[in-house]
Regions:
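Aromatic- and glycine-enriched beta-alpha-beta binding-site module
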Residues: 53-140
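Hydrophobic beta-strand residues in large extracellular and virion-surface proteins
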Residues: 48, 76-78, 154
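Interaction-surface and assembly-scaffold signal
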Residues: 104-242
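Hydrophobic, proline/glycine-rich low-complexity stretches
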Residues: 1-59, 200-242
Length: 242
């Protein structure tokens, strides 16, 4: 495997349960929807993620432009499994990015160009109200496009995060033959988990008005898990030939 570089970021991850047909038709053959089996998000079949990138660095240490070194974007993806090989991967089908030219995220240069990632005007308001060791966090994030908006609003009591090491495989539905391997060292604060009976969420709203996503966000979606990752160090790798 070839190391492409690293990313230092924070992330909000919302795991949802939505209608299966709308997801399956977005996957290339021979991939199938494979709901999350992890304890905190068991049964979820869609993830909506917001990334705040503090720094991207190439493996060679090359200096990147501001637009490439920093970033804000929403990612929509489906936990999936290959029908024949049984490989599991997170299949990304749409990214809304603040990058001025709508470039793919770091590590995906020229892959599925123009078919997965689109530019959006992304605004964020993040506040913390702290009293001794207690903290209440309010976060509002919006991605504005010509045809609609993705708007996320949450208010929660901050918990004590766990430090976790993880590894996962990511593909784009538009060119699923390419794969990236992400190895991460992260802090994980599970704010809400239906399977684990955790709920420190004081307020929540997710509004998606884009026509291309109305078959997914039809009002029947259910939140299974909401996790905040205030610190996330990810190394990005490309397998040989990937």
């Amino acid at each position: 495997m070839t190391e492409l570089g690293m990313m230092l970021l924070s992330r909000v991850r919302i795991a949802l349960r939505v209608g299966l047909p709308a997801l399956q038709r977005r996957l290339p053959d021979p991939w199938d929807v494979h709901p999350d089996s992890r304890d905190a998000s068991q049964g979820a079949n869609l993830a909506v993620l917001f990334y705040e990138i503090f720094l991207n660095q190439t493996a060679e240490g090359l200096e990147l432009t501001t637009a490439d070194a920093l970033g804000r974007y929403f990612v929509l993806g489906i936990p999936s499994r290959h029908r024949r090989t049984e490989e599991t991967a997170f299949m990304v089908f749409r990214i809304f990015t603040a990058h001025p030219t709508g470039e793919n995220p770091f590590g995906w240069n020229r892959i599925a160009a123009g078919r997965t990632t689109v530019h959006a005007n992304i605004v964020r308001s993040h506040t913390v109200e702290a009293n001794n060791l207690e903290a209440m966090v309010s976060d509002r994030i919006e991605a504005h496009l010509d045809k609609g908006v993705v708007a996320l609003e949450l208010r929660y009591r901050r918990g004590v995060p766990k430090r976790v090491a993880s590894e996962g495989r990511v593909r784009f539905t538009a060119e699923s033959e390419h794969v990236r391997v992400y190895r991460a060292d992260e802090l994980v604060d599970v704010v809400k988990s239906v399977p684990a009976a955790v709920d420190r969420l004081e307020g929540f709203g997710l509004r998606v008005t884009l026509p291309e996503l109305t078959d997914i966000f039809d009002g029947s979606e259910q939140v299974v898990n909401l996790t905040v990752q205030p610190w996330f160090l990810r190394r990005v790798y490309a397998p040989s030939g990937g």
